[in-house]
Protein backbone atom coordinates (compact mmCIF):
# COMPACT_ATOMS: atom_id res chain seq x y z
CA UNK A 1 0.00 0.00 0.00
CA UNK A 2 1.40 3.39 -1.02
CA UNK A 3 1.77 6.34 1.34
CA UNK A 4 -1.21 8.15 -0.25
CA UNK A 5 -3.40 5.04 0.06
CA UNK A 6 -2.44 4.69 3.73
CA UNK A 7 -3.34 8.34 4.35
CA UNK A 8 -6.74 7.90 2.62
CA UNK A 9 -7.47 4.78 4.69
CA UNK A 10 -6.43 6.67 7.83
CA UNK A 11 -8.75 9.62 7.10
CA UNK A 12 -11.64 7.24 6.37
CA UNK A 13 -11.08 5.51 9.71
CA UNK A 14 -11.11 8.83 11.57
CA UNK A 15 -14.58 9.75 10.31
CA UNK A 16 -16.03 7.56 13.06
CA UNK A 17 -14.59 9.22 16.17
CA UNK A 18 -14.33 6.91 19.22
CA UNK A 19 -15.48 7.86 22.72
CA UNK A 20 -12.57 8.69 25.04
CA UNK A 21 -13.31 8.53 28.80
CA UNK A 22 -12.02 11.42 30.92
CA UNK A 23 -9.38 10.02 33.27
CA UNK A 24 -6.54 11.40 35.40
CA UNK A 25 -3.56 9.09 36.05
CA UNK A 26 -0.93 9.46 38.77
CA UNK A 27 1.91 6.95 39.04
CA UNK A 28 1.03 4.39 36.40
CA UNK A 29 -2.17 3.28 34.76
CA UNK A 30 -4.06 2.80 31.54
CA UNK A 31 -7.23 3.99 29.86
CA UNK A 32 -9.19 1.76 27.49
CA UNK A 33 -10.69 3.43 24.42
CA UNK A 34 -13.37 1.30 22.80
CA UNK A 35 -12.51 0.25 19.27
CA UNK A 36 -8.96 1.64 19.40
CA UNK A 37 -6.93 0.28 22.28
CA UNK A 38 -5.28 1.44 25.48
CA UNK A 39 -3.47 4.59 26.59
CA UNK A 40 -0.68 3.54 28.95
CA UNK A 41 1.06 5.98 31.30
CA UNK A 42 3.97 5.68 33.72
CA UNK A 43 4.25 9.02 35.49
CA UNK A 44 1.31 11.39 35.28
CA UNK A 45 -1.35 11.84 32.67
CA UNK A 46 -4.71 13.31 31.77
CA UNK A 47 -6.90 11.77 29.09
CA UNK A 48 -10.13 13.26 27.75
CA UNK A 49 -12.04 13.58 24.46
CA UNK A 50 -10.43 17.02 24.03
CA UNK A 51 -6.91 16.54 25.36
CA UNK A 52 -4.20 14.01 26.13
CA UNK A 53 -1.37 15.19 28.41
CA UNK A 54 1.38 12.78 29.51
CA UNK A 55 4.49 13.43 31.62
CA UNK A 56 6.94 10.55 32.02
CA UNK A 57 6.54 7.66 29.61
CA UNK A 58 3.58 6.21 27.83
CA UNK A 59 2.03 4.80 24.70
CA UNK A 60 -1.00 5.74 22.64
CA UNK A 61 -3.00 3.49 20.34
CA UNK A 62 -3.29 4.36 16.67
CA UNK A 63 -6.40 6.26 15.60
CA UNK A 64 -6.30 8.92 18.34
CA UNK A 65 -8.06 12.13 17.30
CA UNK A 66 -8.30 14.97 19.82
CA UNK A 67 -7.83 18.74 19.93
CA UNK A 68 -4.57 18.72 21.88
CA UNK A 69 -1.76 16.22 22.53
CA UNK A 70 1.10 17.15 24.87
CA UNK A 71 3.75 14.62 25.86
CA UNK A 72 6.90 15.23 27.91
CA UNK A 73 9.34 12.36 28.31
CA UNK A 74 9.10 9.20 26.19
CA UNK A 75 6.03 8.41 24.11
CA UNK A 76 5.17 5.90 21.40
CA UNK A 77 2.13 5.99 19.13
CA UNK A 78 1.06 2.63 17.73
CA UNK A 79 -0.33 3.96 14.45
CA UNK A 80 -1.79 7.23 13.16
CA UNK A 81 -2.55 10.31 15.27
CA UNK A 82 -4.38 13.61 14.68
CA UNK A 83 -4.70 16.76 16.79
CA UNK A 84 -5.11 20.48 16.25
CA UNK A 85 -2.17 21.15 18.59
CA UNK A 86 0.54 18.50 19.04
CA UNK A 87 3.59 19.00 21.28
CA UNK A 88 6.28 16.38 21.90
CA UNK A 89 9.24 17.08 24.21
CA UNK A 90 11.77 14.32 24.79
CA UNK A 91 11.45 11.17 22.69
CA UNK A 92 8.47 10.46 20.44
CA UNK A 93 7.99 7.62 17.96
CA UNK A 94 4.89 7.49 15.75
CA UNK A 95 4.39 4.28 13.79
CA UNK A 96 1.94 5.85 11.32
CA UNK A 97 0.86 9.20 9.87
CA UNK A 98 0.77 12.50 11.79
CA UNK A 99 -1.88 15.12 11.03
CA UNK A 100 -1.85 18.38 13.01
CA UNK A 101 -2.64 22.05 12.95
CA UNK A 102 0.59 22.87 14.77
CA UNK A 103 3.23 20.19 15.40
CA UNK A 104 6.08 21.07 17.77
CA UNK A 105 8.89 18.63 18.58
CA UNK A 106 11.90 19.04 20.84
CA UNK A 107 14.39 16.22 21.30
CA UNK A 108 14.05 13.05 19.23
CA UNK A 109 11.04 12.65 16.92
CA UNK A 110 10.28 9.90 14.43
CA UNK A 111 7.24 9.37 12.18
CA UNK A 112 7.07 6.21 10.08
CA UNK A 113 4.35 7.68 7.87
CA UNK A 114 3.70 11.14 6.45
CA UNK A 115 3.52 14.39 8.41
CA UNK A 116 0.79 16.80 7.33
CA UNK A 117 0.50 20.02 9.33
CA UNK A 118 -0.26 23.69 9.00
CA UNK A 119 2.95 24.55 10.88
CA UNK A 120 5.73 22.17 11.92
CA UNK A 121 8.50 23.28 14.29
CA UNK A 122 11.31 20.88 15.11
CA UNK A 123 14.28 21.31 17.46
CA UNK A 124 16.69 18.42 17.89
CA UNK A 125 16.60 15.29 15.74
CA UNK A 126 13.64 14.46 13.48
CA UNK A 127 13.08 11.63 11.01
CA UNK A 128 10.03 11.34 8.73
CA UNK A 129 9.61 8.33 6.45
CA UNK A 130 6.99 9.47 3.92
CA UNK A 131 7.46 13.21 3.46
CA UNK A 132 6.33 16.47 5.04
CA UNK A 133 3.44 18.57 3.74
CA UNK A 134 3.04 21.94 5.50
CA UNK A 135 0.13 24.20 4.60
CA UNK A 136 2.16 27.13 5.92
CA UNK A 137 5.63 26.73 7.43
CA UNK A 138 8.28 24.17 8.31
CA UNK A 139 11.06 25.23 10.69
CA UNK A 140 13.72 22.74 11.75
CA UNK A 141 16.84 23.31 13.84
CA UNK A 142 19.27 20.47 14.48
CA UNK A 143 19.11 17.40 12.25
CA UNK A 144 16.28 16.53 9.87
CA UNK A 145 15.96 13.33 7.83
CA UNK A 146 13.08 13.01 5.36
CA UNK A 147 12.75 9.99 3.08
CA UNK A 148 10.23 11.70 0.78
CA UNK A 149 9.44 15.23 -0.40
CA UNK A 150 9.21 18.39 1.71
CA UNK A 151 6.50 20.85 0.67
CA UNK A 152 5.33 24.11 2.25
CA UNK A 153 3.04 26.77 0.82
CA UNK A 154 4.96 29.49 2.64
CA UNK A 155 8.38 28.92 4.22
CA UNK A 156 10.86 26.07 4.68
CA UNK A 157 13.55 27.20 7.16
CA UNK A 158 16.27 24.63 7.94
CA UNK A 159 19.14 25.28 10.34
CA UNK A 160 21.73 22.60 10.97
CA UNK A 161 22.15 19.40 8.93
CA UNK A 162 19.39 17.95 6.77
CA UNK A 163 18.94 14.99 4.44
CA UNK A 164 15.96 14.99 2.05
CA UNK A 165 15.60 12.09 -0.37
CA UNK A 166 12.96 13.84 -2.47
CA UNK A 167 12.58 17.48 -3.49
CA UNK A 168 11.88 20.63 -1.52
CA UNK A 169 9.08 22.85 -2.85
CA UNK A 170 8.13 26.09 -1.10
CA UNK A 171 7.41 29.76 -1.63
CA UNK A 172 10.60 30.62 0.29
CA UNK A 173 13.47 28.30 1.15
CA UNK A 174 16.09 29.35 3.70
CA UNK A 175 18.95 27.27 5.10
CA UNK A 176 21.81 27.94 7.49
CA UNK A 177 24.36 25.16 7.19
CA UNK A 178 26.06 23.55 10.17
CA UNK A 179 29.54 22.01 10.06
CA UNK A 180 28.08 18.81 8.56
CA UNK A 181 27.02 17.93 5.02
CA UNK A 182 23.40 18.37 3.93
CA UNK A 183 21.72 16.74 0.91
CA UNK A 184 18.54 17.42 -1.07
CA UNK A 185 18.53 14.70 -3.71
CA UNK A 186 15.46 15.86 -5.65
CA UNK A 187 16.41 19.53 -5.96
CA UNK A 188 14.89 22.77 -4.65
CA UNK A 189 12.08 24.83 -6.21
CA UNK A 190 10.83 28.10 -4.70
CA UNK A 191 10.14 31.77 -5.35
CA UNK A 192 13.21 32.76 -3.30
CA UNK A 193 16.14 30.56 -2.24
CA UNK A 194 18.67 31.64 0.41
CA UNK A 195 21.41 29.22 1.56
CA UNK A 196 24.23 30.48 3.75
CA UNK A 197 27.09 28.89 5.64
CA UNK A 198 27.16 29.23 9.39
CA UNK A 199 29.76 31.72 10.52
CA UNK A 200 32.48 29.87 12.41
CA UNK A 201 34.70 31.88 14.72
CA UNK A 202 36.81 28.86 15.64
CA UNK A 203 38.53 29.23 18.99
CA UNK A 204 38.08 32.70 20.50
CA UNK A 205 40.60 34.03 23.05
CA UNK A 206 40.13 37.51 24.53
CA UNK A 207 37.63 38.25 21.79
CA UNK A 208 40.06 37.33 19.00
CA UNK A 209 39.13 34.37 16.73
CA UNK A 210 42.02 31.96 16.08
CA UNK A 211 42.34 28.52 14.45
CA UNK A 212 39.34 29.36 12.27
CA UNK A 213 40.72 27.43 9.30
CA UNK A 214 40.73 24.16 11.30
CA UNK A 215 36.95 24.22 11.80
CA UNK A 216 34.99 22.50 9.04
CA UNK A 217 32.22 24.40 7.27
CA UNK A 218 28.98 22.79 6.18
CA UNK A 219 28.02 22.19 2.56
CA UNK A 220 24.75 21.54 0.74
CA UNK A 221 24.68 19.02 -2.11
CA UNK A 222 21.71 18.98 -4.45
CA UNK A 223 20.73 18.65 -8.12
CA UNK A 224 18.96 21.77 -9.37
CA UNK A 225 18.00 25.01 -7.61
CA UNK A 226 15.19 26.79 -9.46
CA UNK A 227 13.70 30.07 -8.21
CA UNK A 228 11.21 32.49 -9.74
CA UNK A 229 12.95 35.50 -8.21
CA UNK A 230 16.04 35.63 -5.96
CA UNK A 231 18.79 33.06 -5.39
CA UNK A 232 21.61 33.52 -2.87
CA UNK A 233 24.00 30.60 -2.30
CA UNK A 234 27.05 29.87 -0.16
CA UNK A 235 28.86 26.53 0.14
CA UNK A 236 26.52 24.80 -2.31
CA UNK A 237 27.44 22.07 -4.81
CA UNK A 238 24.75 21.49 -7.43
CA UNK A 239 24.14 20.77 -11.11
CA UNK A 240 22.07 23.81 -12.14
CA UNK A 241 20.99 27.18 -10.76
CA UNK A 242 18.18 29.26 -12.22
CA UNK A 243 16.61 32.51 -11.05
CA UNK A 244 15.81 36.13 -11.80
CA UNK A 245 18.52 37.67 -9.60
CA UNK A 246 21.25 35.12 -8.89
CA UNK A 247 24.11 35.51 -6.42
CA UNK A 248 26.65 32.69 -6.31
CA UNK A 249 28.45 33.43 -3.05
CA UNK A 250 31.64 31.96 -1.71
CA UNK A 251 32.47 28.27 -1.79
CA UNK A 252 30.00 27.15 -4.48
CA UNK A 253 30.45 24.64 -7.28
CA UNK A 254 27.94 24.51 -10.15
CA UNK A 255 28.61 21.50 -12.37
CA UNK A 256 26.41 22.41 -15.35
CA UNK A 257 24.56 25.71 -15.92
CA UNK A 258 23.70 28.98 -14.21
CA UNK A 259 20.84 30.86 -15.86
CA UNK A 260 19.35 34.22 -14.86
CA UNK A 261 16.98 36.83 -16.29
CA UNK A 262 18.03 40.14 -14.63
CA UNK A 263 21.22 40.10 -12.53
CA UNK A 264 24.15 37.79 -11.78
CA UNK A 265 27.02 37.88 -9.29
CA UNK A 266 29.68 35.20 -8.81
CA UNK A 267 32.17 35.14 -5.92
CA UNK A 268 35.79 34.54 -7.01
CA UNK A 269 36.07 31.47 -4.74
CA UNK A 270 33.21 29.72 -6.56
CA UNK A 271 33.55 27.59 -9.69
CA UNK A 272 31.15 27.32 -12.63
CA UNK A 273 31.36 24.72 -15.39
CA UNK A 274 30.25 27.35 -17.95
CA UNK A 275 29.64 31.12 -18.07
CA UNK A 276 26.20 32.21 -16.79
CA UNK A 277 23.44 32.43 -19.42
CA UNK A 278 20.86 35.20 -19.54
CA UNK A 279 17.27 34.14 -20.22
CA UNK A 280 14.12 36.11 -21.00
CA UNK A 281 12.33 34.89 -17.83
CA UNK A 282 12.41 32.03 -15.36
CA UNK A 283 9.76 30.12 -13.44
CA UNK A 284 10.12 27.71 -10.54
CA UNK A 285 7.45 25.34 -11.85
CA UNK A 286 5.85 25.04 -8.39
Q: Which residue stretches match the model-derived regions?
A:
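Intrinsically disordered, low-complexity terminal regions
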Residues: 1-286
Amino acid sequence: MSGEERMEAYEEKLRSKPTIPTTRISGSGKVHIEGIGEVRVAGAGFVSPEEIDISGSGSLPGGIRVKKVKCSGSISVEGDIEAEDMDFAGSADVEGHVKAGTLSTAGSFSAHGKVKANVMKSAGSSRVSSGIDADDTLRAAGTLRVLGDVKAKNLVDLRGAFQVDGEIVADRFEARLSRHESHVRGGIRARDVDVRRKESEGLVIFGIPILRRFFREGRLYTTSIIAEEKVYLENVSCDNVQGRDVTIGQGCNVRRKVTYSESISVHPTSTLAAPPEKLASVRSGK
